[in-house]
């Protein structure tokens, strides 16, 4: 499988089966991380981690505190598309990491980025 990253009218294709998405909460300044798998059904959220807790970021039932991180497995199905929009309130956007390295996405307020599994041709799938 491949991950398509759509931004500013362009598509970047990463040949990966999994990735980690991380960002800083705009109010609490707390770090969030999510592990995703790229599947034919969509992007599957496997595990999420929150560094602490605070306003609007309470860990869900069943979360385990380990080394300062609340770790849990979200109960959501595959997502055809994940849309990220920068607030500009944190000074940075998202970090997307794979076994190949990391990319910084959406640092500027108003930047919209979409993540989705690529079609068999390596391009964005029709919506």
Locations of the language-model features?
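N-terminal secretory signal peptides
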Residues: 4-59
